[in-house]
Amino acid sequence: MHKLAHTSFGIVGMFVNTCMVAKYVIINWEMFSMKKVNNDTVFGILQLETLLGDINSIFSEIESEYKMSREEILILLTLWQKGSMTLKEMDRFVEVKPYKRTRTYNNLVELEWIYKERPVDDERTVIIHFNEKLQQEKVELLNFISDAIASRATAMQNSLNAIIAV
């Protein structure tokens, strides 16, 4: 009987040890999984900065080539998409700091991308129009922007996928 008790205790002991090992493995797996999730989450969130850097580099490349700021590019793109509008209406689409507003629009006029019009009945209102004479330059600018985006497409897509996975 002593031998049987010892054997039973041995089996129970092995079972207890197996349960303890299993619990240890589960706890460590949960910690590993949590750590992996945390690392993936942190990596994904950090990709916001990477993606923003890629976007900023596109605008820097455009600025260098075309001598236009981000706001000026966005104003042109908005005009091309929405058509002529007042400065006040444009403010809803493109945020330009008040201290840069006049200089931003005047630069686009100097570069001949846009022209301003004041309605006869309201001298306070200014309407901006795209200069249709620059249609070819518009196509070239859009191609330049498209190429700048395409050259970073894989990196930006990888960043975006990591962000979305968060």
UniProtKB/Swiss-Prot annotation:
GO biological process per UniProt: response to stress
Record's keyword annotation contains Repressor: yes
One Pfam entry name: Staph_reg_Sar_Rot
Keywords, comma-separated and alphabetical: Activator, DNA-binding, Repressor, Transcription, Transcription regulation, Virulence
Start-end of DNA-binding region: 87-110
GO MF entries: DNA binding; DNA-binding transcription factor activity
Cited InterPro entries: HTH_MarR-typ (IPR000835), MarR/SlyA-like (IPR039422), Rot (IPR016998), SarA/Rot_dom (IPR010166), Transc_reg_Sar_Rot_HTH (IPR055166), WH-like_DNA-bd_sf (IPR036388), WH_DNA-bd_sf (IPR036390)
Entry annotated with the keyword Transmembrane helix: no
Domain of life assignment: Bacteria
Function: Global regulator with both positive and negative effects that mediates modulation of several genes involved in virulence. Also, modulates the expression of genes not previously implicated in pathogenesis.
Family: Belongs to the rot family.
Protein name as it appears in the record: HTH-type transcriptional regulator rot
Name of the gene this protein is made from: rot
